[in-house]
Amino acid sequence: MHRYRTHTCGAIRPSDVGQTVRLSGWCHRIRDHGGVLFIDLRDHYGLTQCVIDSDSKAFKAAETARSEWVIRIDGRVRTRPAGTENAELPTGSVEVYIDDLEVLGPAGELPLPVFGDQEYPEETRLKYRFLDLRREKLHANIMKRGAIVDSLRRRMREGGFFEFQTPILTASSPEGARDYLVPSRVHPGKFYALPQAPQQFKQLTMIAGFDRYFQIAPCFRDEDARADRSPGEFYQLDIEMSFVTQEDVFQAVEPVLRGVFEEFAGGKRVTKEFPRITYADAMLKYGVDKPDLRNPLIIADVTDEFADDAVEFKAFKGVIKSGGVVRAIPATGAAGQPRSFFDKLNDWARSEGAPGLGYIVFEEEGGALTGKGPIAKFIPAAIQARIAEKAGAKAGDAVFFAAGTEAKAAGLAGKARIRIGDELKLSDTDQFAFCWVVDFPMYEWNEEDKKIDFSHNPFSMPNFDRDEFLALGEADSEKILGIKAFQYDIVCNGIELSSGAIRNHRPDVMEKAFAIAGYGRDVLEEKFGGMLNALRLGAPPHGGIAPGVDRIVMLLCEEPNIREVVLFPMNQRAEDLMMGAPAEATPKQLRELHIRLNLPEKKA
């Protein structure tokens, strides 16, 4: 017999009745029924009920056991008495009568009980993460994460991709967030950086003549935590392809994500064909560049309607005269809501920094659509009808309005759309709704610096005739601001899973792109000289994307916080409470690295 086990705690079945088995695991729960002890023994694979009474020679040893002690038991499998079965457990029809028990690892008083669903402060959970991970839900999340990563790898290989490993110690990159720096002992005063992403390496892999790259890549960014973003470290499915168009990337990536989500969605529907939504349409119709398509509400522009001379609502008139816009957010079925529903939405809008949300409630009177509400009296019936038509509103619906600069109106309307959809329970949450957002603007006007600047990714290829692009001058600012980039995002349920792009592989086009944004060739050479040199030595057209693994797992585990799907996460202050990181270095370590500390004064 094996030293520790013949079976796992999830493997015992009725077919094993009568056999002598050996199990090892943790005491999940112990129940004393007066001379009879029931020990629920748990391991990675499941749980088996074990029972012992005073007739057993191991009874005294069993009496000493406590929650989370690690024990080994030998015993006979028997059928549970009628009426005591547990249909929720695969082992629920049998139990093991204990003949022998050995304590393998006693446990002290637990700072975090494993049995039960009691919530504990995050600080406690992270400090004792190894205990937290014994809890069923979190344990299942981590196992599901591993299965999802396996599925991603398998699907990528089936798609003709080859897995590469890129360096972890590299040079500091000027784009994105702050770098994590690693001092060099051999080169005093110089530092490596942990990669924010393997962006340049994966492009160099294409320039090196490889064709289809992927990597489950660790990425390191010194940035603040959010619910959907871990501080410090995260993983992404990094992808790059040579000789491809934007559509080729979509055709390669879409089946991978759709397949993984269908495999792990737990019965939820998954979008079959991911719709393409332009950035302009996303901002207009959804108020955000990562639309949640589970919500059926679509925002409409009603600036022209409120600009009509017959409309007397001065608040919106003033906004329009100053160059602003008015957006309409439909609220399906809201006419039947009490006044408090509308008052709460206005209070919420004021908490967002807006003066409020004007609204019209539409009802049918005499066979015609009639608008009521605080601002309806300022708007003629004919224009109300136009507003209702644009917003897709019918009798029994309401329409809310957001006014301001285009950016502010879009932002408020987008948030209101989500809030209204949630309040009215309009969203179909039994699905994973995907889309591609495409045609991002290459440039935008920087009002603060009064100059043209990059809008999103400066290294994406402009969707513009090359010769015409190279000929652009200072007088072409209107044309420049209209240039779109071959850049795309993939969005699921309102969460951005990834950004990607067809790369700018032409040095002359890249130099011109940066020159338009006010960066001289010397700046480009200084910061990206290595990449430019490679591009000058025969670079293929290439493009890629990098969906976030942590966010994919978070969605599929239906967790609101990314720390629930990471094995050993940091807290929001980028601290590892369990291992005590970051930690002070010893004077000897600092001397070896030629580093002297110059710390800020502690605040009183």
Curated annotation (Swiss-Prot):
EC number: 6.1.1.23
Subunit structure of this chain's protein: Homodimer.
Protein's UniProt name: Aspartate--tRNA(Asp/Asn) ligase
Keyword Nucleotide-binding attributed: yes
UniProt region (Aspartate), positions on chain: 199-202
Predominant location: cytoplasm
Catalytic activity: tRNA(Asx) + L-aspartate + ATP = L-aspartyl-tRNA(Asx) + AMP + diphosphate
Molecular function in Gene Ontology: aspartate-tRNA ligase activity; aspartate-tRNA(Asn) ligase activity; ATP binding; nucleic acid binding
Key words, A-Z: Aminoacyl-tRNA synthetase, ATP-binding, Cytoplasm, Ligase, Nucleotide-binding, Protein biosynthesis
GO cellular component: cytoplasm
Protein task: Aspartyl-tRNA synthetase with relaxed tRNA specificity since it is able to aspartylate not only its cognate tRNA(Asp) but also tRNA(Asn). Reaction proceeds in two steps: L-aspartate is first activated by ATP to form Asp-AMP and then transferred to the acceptor end of tRNA(Asp/Asn).
Catalytic class of the enzyme: ligase
SUPFAM superfamilies reported in the protein's UniProt record: Class II aaRS and biotin synthetases (SSF55681), GAD domain-like (SSF55261), Nucleic acid-binding proteins (SSF50249)
Residues where ATP binds: 221-223, 496, 548-551
Compartments it resides in: Cytoplasm
CDD domains in alphabetical order: AspRS_core, EcAspRS_like_N
Family classification: Belongs to the class-II aminoacyl-tRNA synthetase family. Type 1 subfamily.
Domain of life per record: Bacteria
Biological-process GO terms, alphabetical: aspartyl-tRNA aminoacylation
Important for tRNA non-discrimination, annotated site positions: 33, 83
Binding site for L-aspartate: 175, 221, 456, 503
